């Protein structure tokens, strides 16, 4: 192993160690994914704020990627509700900035470690509209659930006007035309909803806050 790889390995170990030490006493919460580019005027920004506020009032720790846009709305909602508002940020050369509405936060160098803790610290996944980063996070959770690498959890996509075409593509291309996922996988692993009431009902059906 060369010096560069040794340094990289040391840094990876340190990030994992710091994450476990920082969050070891936290209950499993709800992780909410979404775009860093969502404006405060967007209906989804307002919905994400309302959802996280209500979840925090119900006792759920709320997690986001710790940045701006939907992530800021998520953290601000939980923060304003005086709940546990966790932000797991990432160092990027542009676009990603820490928001100030967290009760506990950490900034990562490595995406895969950040994604590990966003999964490890959560027991349910909510996916608001977003781009490639949001879809990467959503697909990872779907894959982990399908392959039984994580315990059963709800994965909830928010906004039929945004995600309906994605669900249709899964059905038409993945299930029917190519059979690259099981015919019942979509129904089994993914939920598509519009309202926060639907989200909270799904969460309540899987066993409470802890």
Where are these regions (language model features)?
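Short gly/pro/ser/thr-enriched loop/turn and capping motifs at secondary-structure boundaries
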Residues: 92-97, 134, 162-165
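Glycine-rich beta-alpha loop segments
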Residues: 1-88
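Active-site/ligand-binding-proximal alpha/beta "capping" segment
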Residues: 109-161, 207-210
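Solvent-exposed alpha-helices and their adjacent loops that cap or buttress functional pockets
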Residues: 22-25, 79, 97-100, 117-120, ...
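C-terminal functional extensions of proteins
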Residues: 157-160, 167-210
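Short glycine-rich anion-binding loops that position phosphate/pyrophosphate groups of nucleotides
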Residues: 35-38, 91-93, 130-134
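Short, solvent-exposed amphipathic alpha-helical segments in soluble enzyme
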Residues: 49, 79, 141-145, 171-175, ...
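Acidic/glycine-enriched connector segments
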Residues: 69-128
């Amino acid at each position: 192993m060369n010096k560069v790889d040794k340094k990289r390995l040391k840094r990876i170990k340190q990030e994992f160690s710091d994450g476990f030490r920082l969050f070891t006493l936290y209950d499993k919460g709800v992780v909410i994914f979404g775009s860093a580019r969502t404006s405060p005027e967007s209906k989804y920004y307002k919905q994400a704020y309302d959802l996280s506020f209500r979840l925090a009032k119900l006792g759920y720790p709320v997690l986001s990627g710790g940045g701006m846009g939907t992530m800021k709305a998520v953290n601000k909602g939980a923060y304003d509700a005086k709940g546990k508002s966790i932000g797991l940020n990432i160092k990027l050369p542009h676009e990603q900035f820490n928001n100030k509405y967290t009760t506990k936060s950490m900034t990562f160098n490595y995406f895969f470690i950040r994604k590990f803790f966003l999964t490890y610290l959560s027991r349910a996944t909510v996916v608001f509209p977003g781009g490639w980063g949001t879809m990467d996070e959503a697909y990872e959770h779907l894959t982990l659930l399908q392959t039984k690498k994580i315990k059963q959890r709800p994965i909830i996509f928010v906004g039929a006007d945004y995600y309906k075409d994605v669900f249709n593509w899964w059905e038409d291309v993945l299930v029917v035309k190519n059979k690259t996922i099981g015919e019942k996988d979509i129904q089994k692993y993914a939920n598509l909803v519009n309202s926060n009431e639907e989200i909270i009902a799904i969460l309540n059906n899987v066993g409470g806050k802890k």
